[in-house]
Amino acid sequence: MGLHLTVPGLRRDGRGVQSNSHDTSSKTTADISRCPQHTDAGLQRAATPGISRLLGISSRSVTLTKPRSATRGNSRYHWVPAAAGWTVGVIATLSLLASVSPLIRWIIKVPREFINDYLFNFPDTNFAWSFVLALLAAALTARKRIAWLVLLANMVLAAVVNAAEIAAGGNTAAESFGENLGFAVHVVAIVVLVLGYREFWAKVRRGALFRAAAVWLAGAVVGIVASWGLVELFPGSLAPDERLGYAANRVVGFALADPDLFTGRPHVFLNAIFGLFGAFALIGAAIVLFLSQRADNALTGEDESAIRGLLDLYGKDDSLGYFATRRDKSVVFASSGRACITYRVEVGVCLASGDPVGDHRAWPQAVDAWLRLCQTYGWAPGVMGASSQGAQTYREAGLTALELGDEAILRPADFKLSGPEMRGVRQAVTRARRAGLTVRIRRHRDIAEDEMAQTITRADSWRDTETERGFSMALGRLGDPADSDCLLVEAIDPHNQVLAMLSLVPWGTTGVSLDLMRRSPQSPNGTIELMVSELALHAESLGITRISLNFAVFRAAFEQGAQLGAGPVARLWRGLLVFFSRWWQLETLYRSNMKYQPEWVPRYACYEDARVIPRVGVASVIAEGFLVLPFSRRNRVHTGHHPAVPERLAATGLLHHDGSAPDVSGLRQVGLTNGDGVERRLPEQVRVRFDKLEKLRSSGIDAFPVGRPPSHTVAQALAADHQASVSVSGRIMRIRNYGGVLFAQLRDWSGEMQVLLDNSRLDQGCAADFNAATDLGDLVEMTGHMGASKTGTPSLIVSGWRLIGKCLRPLPNKWKGLLDPEARVRTRYLDLAVNAESRALITARSSVLRAVRETLFAKGFVEVETPILQQLHGGATARPFVTHINTYSMDLFLRIAPELYLKRLCVGGVERVFELGRAFRNEGVDFSHNPEFTLLEAYQAHADYLEWIDGCRELIQNAAQAANGAPIAMRPRTDKGSDGTRHHLEPVDISGIWPVRTVHDAISEALGERIDADTGLTTLRKLCDAAGVPYRTQWDAGAVVLELYEHLVECRTEQPTFYIDFPTSVSPLTRPHRSKRGVAERWDLVAWGIELGTAYSELTDPVEQRRRLQEQSLLAAGGDPEAMELDEDFLQAMEYAMPPTGGLGMGIDRVVMLITGRSIRETLPFPLAKPH
C-alpha cells in the first residue's frame, strides 16, 4: 500500500486525553506476486510509495502557513530544553570526532581538558560517553523529564565536587580559577534547569530507570569479560595484574581513571573496541531510559467497536476509514467520543493513519487530543494519507500540508472498456478471457470457513515477501469474521482453480477500497485487469458506486514531466523517478492505475518542521513493513487490554467486546451524533418552539397526527347557517387572549375566519391550554358551531380542538408578510402561507392551464407526451442543457421544444395534436425568462399559420376569462400623488380582434424608411448603424432584419399584435411564403414588449427541410451553441409525407404574466434561484 507521511506540530490546551498504546507489529498488505515470465504489473497496493518518501518531496507540493500556534504556549523558559540539548550535543559531537580522529583530538586538547576537569565529563577517546551524550542531547531537546533529571543530577554532583575542591584549598591559581568558574557555571545551570522544570514534560515508561540499570549492568559485564579476553590475547605492555582494571576502566569507567595509573598500554586498536563495548551497554541503557511511553497493546474490542460505530455514522466519504480497524494501531478519541485518530509509534514518531474517523465537526477535537498525546510522551507527530479535508484540519491545528500523490478512484457508472484510451485494458481482458478465465465476486460472509482457510493459504503462498506489509492502506487480516462485509474477487481458470484474488474493504455503504491483491505465478497476463474490469462492470448489481484502487506517489511528476513542452526541471525530476523505479516500481504503480482512467484524488502529508522529515520517513518505512527491526513483533496477534474509548461512550453499554459494530440507532439516541459544542445552533424563538414540542410529546400529545377530513372549508363555514355544526382545519395566523376568552384567526386555502374559544363552551380544558400549546403558524383542527362575537363578527364557537401540525419556526411579519422578492422565491411555501396574492396567482395559473386544455379539447385536439430527454437538440434555435445517461454512456439533451416529435405524430396521421409540458433552454434569467418553462405546441392538419391567428387569440382570451372573470389583462401602473408614489394593477381589455402587421412594414414605420425582403445586406447594416442597433458581420440579411425587429418593434409593442412574414433564413422549420419571395409563413404574437407565441405554416417538403437542417448543422459544427443539429430520424419520418399543417407554439408562463400583470418569477411556484 502507498504511504503518506506527515510530521505535525504539537498543541496543548489542557484537555484530557484518552488513548491506548500498541506494539509495532502488523499483518498484511495488498501487493501482488510477480513472475519473470509475466509483464502484467497489476495493481499493487504495496508499500512502494512508502520507500519513495525517503527520496524527498513531491514535485506537486503545497506549503501552507500555520494559522495558529501548535505548542503549549511560550513561557519565559521555553528555550531551556533546546539550549541544554544543543550544549550537550556539541560536546557529544566533539567527543565522537576526537574518538575517531587524532587531529581533532590534538586541536581540542586544551579546551577539552579544561571542560573535563571543571565543567562537564569530556574524555578524549570514549565512544560510550559520546553516544550517551548524544542520546541525552536528543532526550533534552525532546523535553524528556528523565533527561532533565539526569542532567540536573550531573550538575549537582559536579557542583559538589568543585565546592569540595575549593574548600580543601591548596590549589594553584589556575586550578582555583577553574574550580571557581566551574562552580559558578554549575550553580547557574542548576538554577536555569530548576526554573525550566515545567518545560520538560515528556514522560517515559514506568520503571525505566530500573530497566536501564539492568540493561547497562548486563551489557557492562559482557563488555568487561570480552575486553579482558582481548587484553589477554593482545596485552601489549600491560602487566597481567592491570589488564582487568584497564578493561573495566575503558568499558564502564568512561576512561575516567588517569591512564598514568597503568604502567603499560595494550595495542592501540583495542581502546576503540573497548569503547564500543561500553557504548553498546550505555546505548542500550540510555535507549531504555529515554524511551517514551510504548504500546504493549493495541485496539481493544471496545475500541474497535467504537470505531466501527463512527464509520457507520460518518464514514461514507473516507475511502481509508475502514483501515482504522487494523488491530496493531492505537487510538485516541476526542473527549466527545464523536471522532478519533488511529496511530502507531515507531522510533519516537507517532504516525496517524489517514483522516480522523467520525464527525467532521469533531475532527479538531480529535486532532487536539492526538497532538497533546504526542506532546505528553515527546513523540514527533506524523500523518500518512490525509485527504484534502483532513489535511485542512491538520493545517488548522498548526501543521503544514504537503501533497505527495494521488489515490485512484474508479466510478463504475463511468467505467467502460470501449474507446481508444481503454485499448490496453481491453486487450489485456481479452487475453485473459481467451485463456478461459472467469471472475467470481462474493462477500466474505458468503464464503464457507474451509474455503476461506484455503483462500488465506493461497494469499500467503503467493506473497512475494517474507512478512506482510502495510499500515495506512492495509487491513492486516484476511478472513476475520468481523470483516464479513469485505468483498472477494477471484479469477478462476477452466479447471475451477483460483489463480488470483482481490480483497476489498467497505467504503461507506456504496463503495469498496482495495486491501489485498494476489496472483499465482501461473496466472495469464491480463488477470488483474480482468478482475478489476469485471468488478467495475458488475458494480451496480453489488450496490457499489465507487472503487478505491491504489495510491500513486508523485503522480503529478510522472504526468507533467511527460507532457509536450515540459520544462527541464520537470523532465529531470521525472527522469530521477523513472531511474529509482527500477527498484521501487514507482512508475509501474502509477501506470498500472492510470490505464483504468481513474479519478485522481490527492493525498497529503503534514508536518511542522522539515528537519524531521527523514525521521518520519524511517518511521513510515518501519510501519509499512519495509524495514523490520530486531525483536520486531510485527507478526504477532494484537489484542488490547486497556480501552481508550471515552467514559461517556463506554458507559452507554452499546460497545461490544468482540469489536463488532454497535447499534447505530442507539448511538444516535445517546447523542453521539449531536454533542459537545457542535450541536445544532437554533435561534431563540425556534428553540422555544422545540422545547414546547418536547413538552407536548412528554404529555402524550402527538403534534403530527394522522389526518381526517374537515366537514367544511373556511369559506363554506362562513357561508353556513347560524348554529350549524362545522369542523375546519387551518393555520393559526393571529391570537388574541383575553383570559377566559381567546380569539384566533384561522386560515386555509379558501379563506380566513375568526374562531372563538370560551372556557364555558369548551368540552374539555380551557382557552389557556390552547394558548400554552400553540404558536402562530401551528396547524389546528377546530370543531364547534357557527355564531358571532359580541361585535357581530362571524365566528366559529369552538367546542373542541386538536393540534395537527406544530410549526417549529416563526412566520414572517403578520402584517406585511414577505417583502423581499428573493426571499419570496426561496421560501415560496411561506409566501403562500402568509400572502393572499401569492395564493391567487397559483389559482390563476391553474385556471389558465385548465382553460387552454379545455379550449383545445373542445376543438378535437389530442394531448400527448413526448420525450424530455433527447439525443439531439432541435425544434428551436436555443442553447440546450446537457446531461449523461450511464446505461448507454452517451450525452442527452433536455428538450428545448417538442416540435420534432409532434411532427412525427403528424406524419403518423394524428391530425390535431398538442402537448403542454416543460421545456428547457440554457439561456438568461430575467423578469420574462426562466431556464425551464411551460410550453404549448399544437399542430392542426390541413391548416396554415393564418388559421392559428384566431386560434391563439381564442386560447388567450379564454384563459383570461377563466383567471380574471373577463377577457382582460392586468397591467402595472404607477400613480404619483401628494401622498407619494402608488403602484397597482389596472385591467386592460383584450377582447375582440387583434392587429396583424408584416414584419417589414413594422420595421419600415419604426425606421422611417421603407424596407422589404429584397433590401440588400449593405443597406440594412447602414440602417442598423443609424438606429444604433448592434449586429454581427457574419449575419445575413434575414438575421439583421430580425435584430431590427427585436430592437425597434417587439420591445415597443403594447396591445397584442401579430407580426407576420419573417425572413426565411431565420425560420428553418417554416414553409416559404406562398406568394412572397424571401419570407416565410410565420407570425409572432407580441404584447407589451414580450413575445407570447409563434405559429408557422409548417415546412413539409423533406428535401428543402434537409437542406435547411444541414445549414443549421454546419453552424453548430462551427461553434454556434444555439444552432439545431441534423436529426436524421426526423428527416426520414418526413420523407413518408406529412400533410399540410399549421403549428402553434405558445409560452404559457408568459400568458400567465400577461393575464396577471406579474413577472415570471412571481407566477412560477418555484423559479430557479441561485444558491445561498
From Swiss-Prot:
Coiled coil: none
GO molecular function, one term: DNA binding
Enzyme Commission number(s): 6.1.1.6, 2.3.2.3
UniProt superkingdom: Bacteria
Entry keyword Signal: no
Subcellular location: Cell membrane
Other observations noted: There are two lysyl-tRNA ligases in M.tuberculosis.
Protein name: Lysylphosphatidylglycerol biosynthesis bifunctional protein LysX
Organism from which the protein derives: Mycobacterium tuberculosis (strain ATCC 25618 / H37Rv)
Gene behind this protein: lysX
